[in-house]
Amino acid sequence: MASSSTLANDDWKQGLAAPPKDLRPQTEDVTATQGSRFEDFGLRRELLMGIYTAGFERPSPIQEQAIPMALTGRDILARAKNGTGKTASFIIPTLNRINTSLSHIQALILVPTRELALQTSQVCKTLGAHIPNLQVMITTGGTTLRDDILRLQQPVHILVGTPGRILDLGSKGIAGLNKCGIFVMDEADKLLSEDFMPVIEQTLALCPQERQVMLFSATFPWTVKEFKDQHMVQPYEINLMDELTLKGVTQYYAYVEESQKVHCLNTLFSKLQINQSIIFCNSTNRVELLAKKVTELGYSCFYSHAKMQQAHRNRVFHDFRNGMTRNLVCSDLLTRGIDIQAVNVVINFDFPRTAESYLHRIGRSGRFGHLGLAISLLTLEDRHNLYRIESELGTEIAPIPAVIDPVLYVAPAMVEEERESPPPKPAAIAAPPAQQQPQQRQRQHPPVPSHQVAHHSPAAAPIQQQQQQQQQQQQPQYQLAYGQGPPQPQVPFQQANSSPAPAPLPSYPQQAPTQAQGPAQMQSPPSEPATQPQASAQIPVQGQTPPIQPRAQQQGQQQPSQPGQAEGQSQPNRRPNTGGFRGNGRGQGHRGRGRGRGGQPGHPGAGASQSQQAQA
């Protein structure tokens, strides 16, 4: 009798295509539950169908506590780690309470960034795909107001957006919020900061007094307590932050000079088994410069920051989620709420300034209890921030070891597959006579450094073939379009990571080198030959004076003087200063132009010599 009842309850699963199960191990951040199921919450059948097709098997700890209380209509103040399922904790009860027979806005979800709004609206549509006539709308800054006005003339049940655009539409009467009974704030600590607090209070005033307010975040500053006392009624508080950082994320730091950061990043790319990676910089200018350097190294990457056009930002975010590239260079724009399951490595190219920023950055890896790796590149000036962040977060960031075991950030099944696959046997490739002469000419060029090609062919492919492939990769240079590098083949990341030997280059000229296999041997950066410009490539720090070039290079870069040229600028065809004598005001020696420090041979000065005054 019980079995027939269970079968009847599971009839709704027939005909639904469930996604393949994720066999990767999970940490206690998402597995330490009481054994509840989504069917135990009394959700509507259409919503259960959406949860099943989305691949949600069992609720996480935050979902297990938040969903039942949210279904009762009570205010909720929830604090949980990044990547533990906070988004579904408020979307599932919100969808369950929506009445699609009504045409007005019934739920308002506020998020701090446009990318997070795009992701949240997509989750609403995915989980509510089987709810008939459900209408979800997203509105953010950077889009035309006319399109939003036309869209709001049609029925909208859930409105997702950023605070500024929501207040603009609500204050003008375009978006009717007077019947909105559910008010949700994701990443509430950011929304309740000084930048958003006045906008939030004005928007909340447009909603009715009988409303449900739900706040979700990983960190709660003192401003949250003030908001709770003023606008929430006996909220149900949930705190699952026994520790701030995720248990599945391994954290390392490495001390490097600013001029060697690009070279260190290249070494990490070649040694780590990267599925997808996010690289963070502290300024928009450095984001674009680093993305160009990564592309020049032969790796495909996108970049994104707040100064880009909204259409480009949406396209970058969409393509990166769909696996169009492995690497994304960005600012702190994508530190909050962005959920990309394939990201297993986060690199802080610039060390964050605050503990809050560091916490949200490393939370982009190890999503939903999976394994991840966070590596920070530090200069000597960053060591004080390192100690402060460690003390504030109560965590320990270890120095990067000589060997990084892939078990720490790669799924065990993939690691075992890599170890069990035998290395390919070397094969002698006989080139046709027409190709013999070009190979002879290639031998005259300096050989490719060993640290660049060692990870490509551990099984001993011919050296000439390796050099030829390296030169073919370095010949063309792509012009970045919104951060996009050379295209990559559409293959699963698991297959791409397990490539045992270098394959012939495809039709496009550049391709990201295959990630290394086995444990990563981290070595100190070797001395660079003159033929490798990227090793010494330096991205200027914002606000820092560029390094002074030698005088010989300055003269080679001088431009002919133009009429109206400012006094003191370089003149064309000027002979170098051969000597100067110490003077008390104006240089007296041959070509001497020094004031005070012109006494040693070869020291240029700042004053004009008498001969130059006579010519003037």
Swiss-Prot record:
Biological processes per GO annotation: mRNA processing; mRNA transport; regulation of translation
Compositional bias segments (type: Low complexity): 427-441, 458-500, 508-523, 550-579, 606-616
Tagged with keyword Magnesium: no
Polar residues composition bias: residue spans: 529-545
SUPFAM superfamilies the UniProt entry points to: P-loop containing nucleoside triphosphate hydrolases
Intervals of motif DEAD box: 186-189
Gene3D superfamilies listed in its UniProt record: P-loop containing nucleotide triphosphate hydrolases
Catalyzed chemical reaction(s): ATP + H2O = ADP + phosphate + H(+)
Compartments, record wording: Cytoplasm, P-body
Residues forming coiled coils: none
GO molecular-function term, one example from the UniProt record: ATP hydrolysis activity
GO cellular component labels: P-body
UniProt-listed Enzyme Commission number(s): 3.6.4.13
Binding site for ATP: 80-87
Domain annotation Helicase C-terminal: ranges: 248-408
Null mutant phenotype: Leads to an accumulation of autophagic bodies and increases autophagic flux accompanied by increased accumulation of ATG8 mRNA and protein in nutrient-replete conditions.
Protein family (similarity comment): Belongs to the DEAD box helicase family. DDX6/DHH1 subfamily.
PANTHER family: DEAD-BOX ATP-DEPENDENT RNA HELICASE 50 (PTHR47960)
Protein name from the UniProt record: ATP-dependent RNA helicase VAD1
Lineage: Eukaryota, Fungi, Dikarya, Basidiomycota, Agaricomycotina
